């Protein structure tokens, strides 16, 4: 993978951290599960109906306020820093989140280092930590252009025997032009797919008998 692709993955991973922080701040009852960078952008899975709480309805209509909070966090140019924790420290930090504790157990069993990335200064206002291997950009201010794209359901660990979580997809780029170009390409691809589907279903041809 080229340096630029690595840099883009780090940027998108950081955008995902900003997104899940915004989601958690706006919907405090949700439990964050996991969220990687991908070839196309990033996503985050979260539990919107944790045991013992009333379900929280998060829809694409909420993207406007989530993106607004993300912009605020980006404008603050918060540092994103890596920290190594002991198993006990990780258990204390994520005591109220069974998904994170499951990850801590898995990491510990493998004998790997437990690392978290803090957005903002640990423990201060506008800060949040998440289990993560990284890498990330140095601060939220490096995120120049992003967009939340869609919402879907996803089973925990991709196993239908597990609980269905809520997944938000998004993407990020180094510039607004790159983001705009990407969104344009996606829109054109969607139109082509719609046209193909229409032709397959014969939606765009009409019988003289009708």
Q: What is the meaning of each model-derived region?
A:
Residues 1-10, 31-34, 43-210:
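Auxiliary tRNA-acceptor-end handling modules of aminoacyl-tRNA synthetases
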Residues 8-27:
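Active/ligand-binding-proximal structured segments within catalytic/core domains
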Residues 36-38:
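Structural signature of FAD isoalloxazine-binding scaffolds in flavoprotein oxidoreductases
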